Curated annotation (Swiss-Prot):
Its EC number is 4.2.1.20. Pathway: Amino-acid biosynthesis; L-tryptophan biosynthesis; L-tryptophan from chorismate: step 5/5. It comes from Chloroflexus aggregans (strain MD-66 / DSM 9485). This is Tryptophan synthase alpha chain. Keywords: Amino-acid biosynthesis, Aromatic amino acid biosynthesis, Lyase, Tryptophan biosynthesis. GO terms for molecular function: tryptophan synthase activity. Belongs to the TrpA family. It catalyses: (1S,2R)-1-C-(indol-3-yl)glycerol 3-phosphate + L-serine = D-glyceraldehyde 3-phosphate + L-tryptophan + H2O.
Length: 267
């Protein structure tokens, strides 16, 4: 049983869903990720999505685009992101760590090299929003050979036949996109989210983790009625952007603790 599977099994038995923060590696400062992840894990975060900075982040809204630009200005590369994973393991972080990035930079870096290095660093998988199912055929076996999960996306616009195909090739968990459009904090989640999750649940036992638009404890509580985890990204990045440097870790920790308080399963 790998780290991701173990994490969801443990949460299920304790009656909670996962809270998964997204952090852009090297934002706000180059070393920030090394300070934030251990603190947020201690606050109750269960898994981490660590973003590789890229100059053309298609799926991301303005908040994460700004964070990405800052990380690029800080000189952060794919190799640095993999090193960050190893450094977090050296700091005794136990939670699953997944790198989120876009496919072209990964392809240029080398799929075999990237997977071998991430596995050796103690990483658990990849989240690649611009990689459609058909094109994932090259990366999937390489990732699997290194015991890394390749996380697949299902959106409100994904047709039922396509959901069946995606589920057949998925591992780790499924990333359920709660809204159409780019990432960013919203006031409400999609009205048809429950229907989408019901459709996917009929086809798989994999954990379902909801992302895009989650910013409040009420959103997490809503997800806890439906799914197995909630991802918070833009709302966390937004706080880190606004907080004074001396208050970033404590402010982010307080926010994550508030969201974790809403993770009790109610279905």
């Amino acid at each position: 049983m790998n780290r991701i599977t173990e994490t969801f099994a443990r949460l299920r038995s304790s009656g909670r869903i996962a809270l998964m923060p997204y952090l852009t590696v090297g934002f706000p400062e180059r070393e920030s990720t090394l300070e934030l992840v251990p603190a947020l894990e201690a606050a109750g975060a269960s898994l981490f999505e660590l973003g590789i900075p890229f100059s053309d982040p298609l799926a991301d809204g303005a908040t994460i685009q700004r964070a990405t630009q800052r990380a690029l200005e800080n000189g952060v590369t794919i190799a640095d992101c993999i090193t960050t994973v190893a450094q977090l393991r050296a700091r005794n972080v136990k939670a699953p760590l997944l790198l989120m990035g876009y496919y072209n930079p990964l392809l240029r870096y080398g799929l075999e090299r990237a997977c071998a290095e991430l596995a050796a660093a103690g990483g658990d998988g990849w989240i690649i929003p611009d990689l459609p199912l058909e094109e994932a055929a090259e990366l999937r076996p390489i990732a699997a050979a290194h015991h890394l999960d390749l996380i697949m996306f299902i959106a409100p616009t994904t047709p039922p036949t396509r959901i069946t195909q995606i589920v057949a090739h998925a591992s780790g968990f499924l990333y359920i996109v709660s809204l159409t459009g780019v990432t960013g904090a919203r006031q409400t989640l999609a009205a048809n989210l429950a229907d989408l999750i019901t459709t996917v649940r009929q086809q798989t036992d994999l954990p379902l983790v909801v992302g895009f638009g989650i910013s409040q404890p009420s959103h997490v509580a809503e997800v806890a009625r439906l799914a197995d985890g909630a991802i918070v990204g833009s709302a966390l990045i937004d706080r880190l952007e606004r907080l004074a440097p001396s208050e970033r870790v404590s402010g982010a920790t307080a926010y994550i603790r508030e969201l974790v308080s809403a993770t009790e399963r109610v279905h």
